[in-house]
Design a protein with these regions (language model features):
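Primary recognition of N-terminal secretory signal peptides and signal-anchoring hydrophobic helices
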Residues: 2-152
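C-terminal and inter-domain tail/linker signature
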Residues: 150-410
Length: 410
């Protein structure tokens, strides 16, 4: 099929205008809408419209706001199907006029309303496609007629963590709630000011933050990363909870000193990073929760092999090698009191093939510890695993009273 440029596609739409209806019932011109993208107010020649209380934006203007080039490589139109295909930033999005869903990287995703192709040849797209395809934050305030399209929560978190490299608090001030921030790291006082102070104090400390994985589950964003301070390296997980306005209101984390490669040659942080199977998120979360409850907390070792594909298992724990056989030995040692025992699950987060479980356990010293286990699922079986274990200090040493796990949710 011959590809058309956006300009040519719109010209083709004009030819088809006799076959295309005008704005349908329930569609209202919305000339008073203010659109802000990444903090910049947009001046659209063609105003957005509102349909069934949902905002739709003209495709060309939305593409320009997002930095999507208006060329045939990035946007094409299929006249016969009345569909538009957008290729940008690792996402291929197909929108069909009259359809209340988008196809994103081959997966059907429901939208708040249907794409509209007007009699005048203008394609209006539901603004939530921006969130579904590119992870942008979308906030619509009907009272003020203001639409905000901004930095995704994932990007906010990465930007804040990278702030420790420079000591610049600008990102944290922008994205962390000034009055509602709850801190669960016992080494910091609660509230935003203590977090900002921590960033400021890192200036000139030779800090390097390397983010390896970022997953988002609803309002929660979890990051798996390596942090070096003056040459001393740690591996960590951070979890940030956002409110409906895109502000961070709660934070948990877990850190462990980096260890040498394990018996199979893996580090604590390397391995698979690509998120796949977004439609399997809940299924995979259920699988991993069942595994942890059954095998780790419940100590049902007989069920272990049913969660794996034979002996195919990539292990990033620094003490053990690949294979289910190696895991069996580790769990057997734990059963004899040589290692740790899982007591309680506090949180399960997932996105696609990755599932993060936050649990509480007993350390060899008899004190409590937190463990963050990250699993990668492939074809319904556990395929890869990372973890970070950190002992919880005595309450007398805490700088806040929020607890390591309090208010976590499953």
């Amino acid at each position: 099929m011959k590809k058309h440029t956006v300009t040519a596609a719109l010209a083709g739409l004009l030819v088809l205008s006799s076959a295309v209806p005008a704005l349908a019932a329930g569609v209202k011109p919305a000339t008073g809408i203010q659109v802000w993208v990444d903090g910049k107010k947009e001046a659209y020649k063609i105003a957005p419209i509102v349909r069934n209380k949902q905002v739709l934006i003209p495709l060309r203007q939305l593409a320009t706001s997002l930095g999507i080039p208006l060329d045939a490589k990035h946007i094409t139109f299929n006249t016969a199907r009345q569909s538009t295909t957008i290729r940008y930033d690792q996402a291929t999005v197909v929108l069909v006029s009259g359809s209340p869903e988008a196809q994103i990287n081959g997966i059907k995703v429901p939208l708040s309303t249907s794409t509209i192709l007007t009699k005048q040849g203008v394609t209006y797209v539901p603004v939530d496609v921006v969130k579904e395809a590119w992870g942008k934050q979308v906030i619509w305030d009907p009272a003020s007629q203001t639409l905000q399209i901004g930095v995704s929560n994932k990007d906010k978190v990465v930007e804040i963590l990278k702030s420790f490299e420079t000591g610049n608090t600008k990102a944290a001030e922008a994205w962390i709630s000034k009055d509602q921030y709850i801190q669960h790291n016992p080494s910091f006082a609660s509230g935003r000011d203590a977090f900002l102070q921590g960033i400021s104090q890192s200036k000139g400390a030779n800090v390097l933050v390397e983010v390896q994985r970022v997953i988002q589950d609803g309002n929660d964003v979890a990051v798996h990363y390596k942090k070096s301070i003056a040459g001393k390296t740690s591996i960590g997980f951070d979890i940030f909870r956002f409110d409906s306005n895109g502000k961070i209101v709660e934070h948990w984390d877990n850190m462990q000193d980096s260890a040498p490669i394990n018996p199979s040659g893996h580090t604590m942080i390397d391995g698979t990073t690509q998120i796949t199977d977004p439609n399997q998120t809940e299924t995979n979360k259920t699988l991993i929760r069942k595994f942890v409850d059954d095998v780790l907390v419940g100590k049902n070792r007989a069920a272990l092999e049913s969660y794996y594909n034979g002996d195919q298992y990539i292990q990033h724990n620094p003490l053990f090698g690949d294979g289910v056989s190696s895991l069996k030995q580790a769990l057997s040692a734990a059963g004899q009191g040589a290692s740790i025992g899982y007591d309680q699950v506090h949180m399960v987060l997932g996105e696609g093939n990755f599932v993060l479980v936050v649990s509480e356990l007993k350390s060899p010293k008899g004190t409590s510890a937190a463990v963050y286990d990250l699993f990668r699922v492939e074809n319904g079986k556990i395929a890869e695993h990372w973890d970070v274990v950190q002992e919880i200090p005595a309450k007398t040493e805490w700088k806040n009273t929020n607890g390591k796990f309090l208010k976590m949710h499953i």
